[in-house]
Amino acid sequence: MNLNELRKEIDVIDEQMMELFKKRMSVSKNIGKLKKVMGLPIIDNAREEMILEKRKAALGNDELIPYYQAFLIKLFDLSKEYQHHV
């Protein structure tokens, strides 16, 4: 594959990730609303740690673990920020 073909492949993946991101943030918004009604805090550190460990084990690529964990942590932060605005 040449550079342009690889970039097109990344573009397709980015489109798929965008759709998944929109779905995830919609669910996150609903979780934020439910937490508000239930009087629960937005932040659940134990759950975040559990997810990080579970995903780390499932990733199957030790080289990518620190990058994927950084990605997830940023995603958690964005979700919490979004929930604060609900």
Model-assigned labels for residue ranges:
Residues 1-86:
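Domain-level signature for soluble enzymes in the chorismate/prephenate branch of the shikimate pathway
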